[in-house]
Regions:
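Serine/threonine-rich, repeat-prone extracellular segments and beta-strand-based repeat modules
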Residues: 532-574
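Glycoside hydrolase catalytic-domain groove-lining segments
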Residues: 154-156, 298-304, 319-391, 408-419
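Solvent-exposed, low-complexity, repeat-rich "mucin-like" stalks and linkers
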Residues: 501-534
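Aromatic-rich peripheral "rim/lid" segments of glycoside hydrolase catalytic domains that contact
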Residues: 114, 377-386, 392, 397-405, ...
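Active-site cleft segment of glycoside hydrolase catalytic domains centered on the general acid/base Glu
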Residues: 182-183, 187-192, 218-325, 330, ...
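Gram-positive cell-envelope targeting signals
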Residues: 1-76, 130
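Aromatic-lined substrate-binding rim segments of carbohydrate-active enzymes
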Residues: 151-218, 278-303, 351-354, 358-360
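N-terminal carbohydrate-binding accessory modules
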Residues: 80-164
Length: 575
């Protein structure tokens, strides 16, 4: 996951007279043409700013992501002890017993606060996943989570009740500075993964461990080498990575965590652990995969190995990546993709990429990360990565219903393409203080913001400059006070759907254009969008006569005209 901070924009429904809401007609007249105001494309304008170079046998100077930590320059050469790789018969797995409580999926449609279209043939084994890595830091900061009954309870119980069957947890090698201060973002070390993983296992959910093989965020813009591995050559680093994987995974399994999938690397399009040449990255991947295989054998369970990439919308990216993995003999079971609809193109393209991997290489595919906002508001005063109309995808509003629709539709597209399932990214990352409060001391102390100032010693170019609070709270599936949203129930409602009283979701603004000097024809109807999209309809509209008369099509400009919907069946606020 990468972060982009943007100023939030909040749109409000306009009202006319006696509290009645209206639809609005937005127009602009410029460069000789009367046209609708720009609504944005639903894509992130910064998504390509980190560069598009493919990992491969190119010069390291040509690669865009940060790989070696800046502060490491000029350090003396360190002598590293030789690491002997443990085989399965040298690994001791004696899992702690955890009493497990499970929750069944419904056997028919449910009544809910949202409408969910059923996916008739979806399997109960379809991965309904949630990345919940920041939970412990959020809780340590004083925030609380609640169940659907409004009572405080373990967030993992709430997730399981909502149909989540898989939890994804990131692991950083050493996310602390020399004084033990956490870098933030959840301070996700192995001990944190163990504590959260045990709680997930307690409620019957499988666990995916996401090794970043870095001390902090690893994504296409940066893949910093862990501090302890600085100065290592490739062979030493491969051995260290193997040992870290074996030791960490063994500790997690022995704690009783039901690990069933392991990611070796996170969004590694541009490199991993400071390596950028694909031949070198492949050696690290093979070391990580081999470590998982040996631990899996020692544990007597089938732990799947996943490799994780993003930017699947870029032409040729997936084909080049998978060809390189095959060329260098990387052993893996699952091709994991990040798919954020506001950054990574259409669902149809996502399906095509998945089917290409399946058909060409016989690998399974999972969506390792996705999300969508339920509001454009900011919950903690620190700004959000996704906010405003320009970040939204056509047809999916920033509402609880819009979030539910997006998750349901991504799951439907994934199921149609024989994808294993979907992990929602950080749906539990909520604010730890109100937006109008100074929460910085809490973020610094407990690591509940995306980065703390202490991370600057490790990542001075990004986190060290732009540290702060949670940039994802408006995409969580809990509100700003920790109460679950109805959209969280989509996981349990995928197969049979959910019904809700028919309600208007929005009345979108209408946009028209005409040439300068031409006659302007205003539309006679406006669309009314419902929570059940099959009920959407066109309704007659009367535009404000005074505002309409003020339009001069002989002069370039922009105009906004309010209109009244003519339908007695609509609630008064929408007429």
């Amino acid at each position: 996951m990468r972060f982009y901070l943007k100023k939030a924009l909040v749109g409000n429904l306009k009202k006319l007279g006696s509290g009645m809401a209206v639809t609005a007609l937005s127009m602009s007249l410029c460069a000789g043409v009367l046209s609708g105001c720009d609504k944005g494309t639903g894509t992130d304008s910064n998504a390509g700013s980190s560069g598009n170079m493919q990992v491969g046998e190119s010069s390291a100077d040509d690669l865009k992501p940060e790989t070696e930590n800046p502060e490491s320059e000029g350090e003396s050469i360190t002598q590293f002890p030789v690491i002997e790789r443990k085989a399965a018969d040298e690994i001791e797995i004696n899992p702690e017993k955890i009493d497990v409580t499970t929750f069944s999926l419904p056997d028919g449609p449910e009544e809910s606060g949202i409408f969910v279209q059923p996916i008739a043939d979806i399997s109960d084994d379809f991965i309904r996943g949630m990345d919940a890595s920041a939970v412990l830091a959020v809780e340590n900061s004083g925030a609380k989570y609640y169940g659907f009954d409004g009572e405080e309870q373990d967030v993992f119980k709430t997730l399981a009740e909502a149909g989540v069957n898989y939890i994804r947890l990131r692991v950083w090698n050493d996310p602390y500075d020399e004084n033990g201060n956490g870098y933030g973002g959840g301070n996700n070390d192995v001990a944190t993964a163990i504590e959260l993983g045990k709680r997930a296992t307690q409620y019957g959910m499988k666990v995916c461990i996401d090794f970043h093989y870095s001390d902090f965020w690893a994504d296409p813009t940066k893949q910093y080498v862990p501090k302890a591995w600085k100065g290592m050559n490739l062979e030493q680093k491969s051995d260290a990575l193997y040992d870290f994987t074996v030791t960490s995974l063994t500790d997690i399994l022995n704690a009783g965590v039901d690990v069933c999938m392991v990611q070796v690397g996170n969004e590694i399009n541009k490199g991993m652990s400071g390596e950028t040449f694909m031949s070198s990255v492949a050696e690290l991947l093979k070391a990580g995969s081999s470590a998982v295989r040996e631990v899996s054998k020692a544990a007597g369970k089938d732990i799947q190995v996943a490799v994780h990439y993003t930017d699947i919308d870029k032409q040729g990216e997936v084909a080049k990546i998978t060809a390189d993995l095959d060329k260098y003999g990387v052993d893996y079971d699952i091709f994991a993709m990040s798919y954020y609809s506001f950054w990574h193109g259409s669902m149809e393209n996502m399906q095509e990429m998945a089917e290409y991997v399946q058909d060409t290489y016989g690998k399974k595919v999972v969506i390792a990360e996705t999300s969508y906002c339920y509001t454009t508001e900011d919950g903690d005063g620190s700004g959000n990565s996704v906010s405003g109309d320009g970040d939204l995808v056509d047809g999916y509003d920033a509402t609880v219903q819009g979030q539910a629709d997006m998750l349901r539709d991504i799951c439907a597209a994934a199921d149609e393409a024989d994808i294993m399932g979907v992990f929602y990214w950080e749906g539990t990352w909520i604010p730890v203080g109100p937006a109008d409060a100074d929460n910085s001391s809490i973020w610094e102390k407990y690591g509940s913001g995306w980065a703390s100032s202490y991370s600057g010693s490790y990542d001075p170019k990004d986190a060290g400059k732009y540290y702060g609070g949670c940039s994802w709270d408006n995409q969580a599936m809990f509100d700003f006070t920790g109460h679950p949203l109805d959209s969280l129930k989509v996981f349990r409602e995928l197969k049979y759907g959910a019904t809700a009283p028919l309600a208007v979701e929005k009345v979108p603004d209408v946009e028209v254009s005409c040439n300068v000097g031409a006659e302007l024809a205003l539309p006679e109807t406006a669309q009314v969008v419902y929570n059940d999209k099959t009920a959407n309809r066109e309704v007659p509209v009367v535009w404000d006569a005074e505002q309409t008369a003020a339009i001069d099509t002989n002069i370039g400009g922009s105009y906004q005209v309010e209109g009244i919907l003519q339908d007695e069946e609509l609630d008064e606020e929408y007429r």
